[in-house]
UniProtKB/Swiss-Prot annotation:
Organism name: Colletotrichum graminicola (strain M1.001 / M2 / FGSC 10212) (Maize anthracnose fungus)
Gene that this polypeptide is encoded by: LCL3
Source lineage: Eukaryota, Fungi, Dikarya, Ascomycota, Pezizomycotina
Protein's recorded name: Probable endonuclease LCL3
Domain of life where this protein originates: Eukaryota
Subcellular localization, as worded in the UniProt entry: Mitochondrion; Membrane
Active site: R134, E142, R182
């Protein structure tokens, strides 16, 4: 008989001690005591940050190696990058009408160059840190070197090139490394809103000839444009084409002649030794 002042629900519900007895009496197997494996989704959530961090680190390393790594000299450029990469840099010196030195600035202003990172300006600071570049597809008149007299038009070509690219940002599409450890490349500089092919501009003004060789000439895909510009400047008698055709000597012919002359001199002196 239930207590008159108690409710029927409380009378029918098990007591705390009865619950404990029921819990103790529930059979337990060995498998129930083993730790339950995490569901696949839960495991994926735990490992996802580690995986994503590894992938991001690898991607950052690859991006640095391919786009932000600075090449101090031509010797630091891997052979497999030639004909594939365009390097951004600043011209630090112009030594002749068709070659110069550049300081590689990968990433440009986005990587902090010119506002967080400065390009050195002194010869001492630049020593061993620049890439010598030989412009592809053209040959400017030879200046006075090693006791050789300079060609007509050499001073004009050098002066123009200095005014056009010295201390300027340039884009260099690299083709190969030559026997003098220079990078043979097609060179571009921004003029107002457009990028100009520097070699092509020199040909248009009659400041250079197309490179004369039977094989191994690097054109950068612009052979037709270069030869057309040369022919047009020649027809207008611009620059080096302003003199008599009968007395004109191309830079290639000049180098061949002077090399032969020096070779004969060395043979003559060796006969007296």
């Amino acid at each position: 008989m239930p207590w008159p002042f108690s409710s029927s629900s409380s009378a029918g519900s098990p007591t705390h001690s009865q619950k404990e007895d029921g819990a103790r009496s529930k059979p337990t197997s060995w498998n129930d005591l083993l730790p339950k494996p995490d569901p696949p989704l839960h495991a994926a959530k735990e490992w996802a940050p580690v995986f994503l961090t590894s992938v991001a680190s690898l991607a950052a390393f690859i991006f640095y190696q391919s786009r932000l790594r600075r090449f101090p000299t031509a010797g630091h450029i891997q052979p497999d990058l030639f004909r594939k990469r365009t390097l951004l840099g600043r011209v630090t010196s112009v030594g002749d009408g068709d070659n110069f030195h550049m300081f590689h600035t990968p990433g440009g202003r986005l990587a902090g160059w010119d506002w967080l990172r400065k390009v050195p300006t002194t010869k001492t600071a630049l020593k061993g840190k620049t890439i010598p570049v030989r412009m592809a597809g053209i040959d400017a008149p030879e200046g006075a070197h090693f006791g050789r007299p300079g060609q007509p038009g050499a001073a004009e070509a050098l002066q123009w090139l200095r005014s056009y690219i010295l201390d300027k940002r340039i884009w260099v599409r690299i083709h190969r490394r030559d026997q003098y450890d220079r990078v043979v490349a097609t060179v571009y500089v921004r003029r107002f809103l457009f990028k100009k092919d520097v070699g092509l501009e020199m040909l248009k003004l009659g400041l250079a000839t197309t490179y004369e060789a039977k094989s191994g000439v690097e054109w950068g895909g612009a052979e037709e444009a270069y030869k057309a510009a040369e022919a047009k400047a020649q027809s207008k008698r611009l620059g080096i084409w302003n003199g008599e055709a009968s007395t004109f000597e191309s830079p290639r012919a000049y180098k061949t002649r002077t090399n032969e002359t020096e070779g004969k001199k060395s043979e003559w002196f060796s006969g007296w030794s």
